[in-house]
């Protein structure tokens, strides 16, 4: 193990190719690298597996927003299960390789993703809507109106 960084080394480095120079990682050769984590989540899927989703509640609805850059609506599936579970899933395919192509970087994520959310009792399951614009999926789940308790005035006798 060398303590001197190899700025021009690495799997995809070429001294004469300005796009292939890897950023030096001082912990790369240490025994505590994330090899166990890397084995369970391959690098090409790691970012996609953890698709970010925001969930906010307004007075009228529960609103979910998922960042899905570069995906088309045909590649995404939104489902509601009987037990009030909202499921957002999809798959981004790996770009087809041409034997004449030379890759300098391969950093964009690919693979499948799935996120599940248990919806509260007040969710109107039959009125869920989804829209996708500029790589952001928005799922709107309307809420049932909360009934105000009836107040009955009682006459006081005596």
Curated annotation (Swiss-Prot):
Keywords: Cytoplasm, Stress response
Domain sHSP stretches: 44-158
Subcellular location: Cytoplasm
Presence of the UniProt keyword Lyase in the record: no
Primary residence: cytoplasm
InterPro entries to which the protein is assigned, alphabetical: A-crystallin/Hsp20_dom, HSP20-like_chaperone, Small_HSP
Transmembrane region(s): none
Gene induction: By stress.
GO cellular component: cytoplasm
Top-level lineage group: Eukaryota
Keyword Cytoplasm among UniProt keywords: yes
PANTHER family (alphabetical): HEAT-SHOCK PROTEIN 20 FAMILY MEMBER (PTHR11527)
Subunit structure: Forms oligomeric structures.
Family: Belongs to the small heat shock protein (HSP20) family.
Descriptive protein name: 18.2 kDa class I heat shock protein
Protein species of origin: Medicago sativa
